Amino acid sequence: MKLSEMRNKVTGLPDGFAGTKKDWKDVAETFRIEKAAILEKDKKDESGEVILYKKGPKQGQPVPDRQIAMQLRTASGEAVLVRTNSPRIVTLYTGDLDRECDEVNRFGDRIYHVEAPEGELKFVPYEMDKKKDGKPLKWDVADLEEVD
């Protein structure tokens, strides 16, 4: 099974999703990210619109929430939105989606969290984000269900 197929199966992305611009338009509608998810809470512009980034693509203008998935993909190279079950963390997958994968290590080491403290995106390797006694925890794809 190709990694792209495994990712679609695990995340619920539609069959045939390949990460093209059209796919992302479709999936951005499906996986709508709450505006508060990637922003400094309650930060608004003069018109009262919530600002998604301190510096958006057009010098700080508000970004419609349906565009966030596509922008995160652009910002991280080949990122694919995996899940958004936290108000401020978005988990992305990056890498070669055509390589073969197995059940034990389906996502390799290419899972990242995107944290947005105060509206600024910051990439953190997933395995470094979960620690116990100061040491990174070993994880597998089941951990994706436990991200909070």
Mark where each language-model region is.
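Short nucleic-acid-contacting surface segments enriched for D/E, G, S/T with interspersed K/R
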Residues: 92-121
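OB-fold ssDNA-binding interfaces and closely related basic DNA-contact patches used
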Residues: 1-84
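Intrinsically disordered, low-complexity segments enriched in proline/serine/threonine
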Residues: 16, 59, 64-66, 89, ...
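Short acidic, glycine/tyrosine-flanked loop/strand segments centered on an H-E-D-like triad
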Residues: 75-100
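Acidic, low-complexity, intrinsically disordered interaction modules
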Residues: 57-65, 92, 101-105, 130-131
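OB-fold/S1-family single-stranded nucleic acid-binding modules
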Residues: 110, 115-117, 121-148
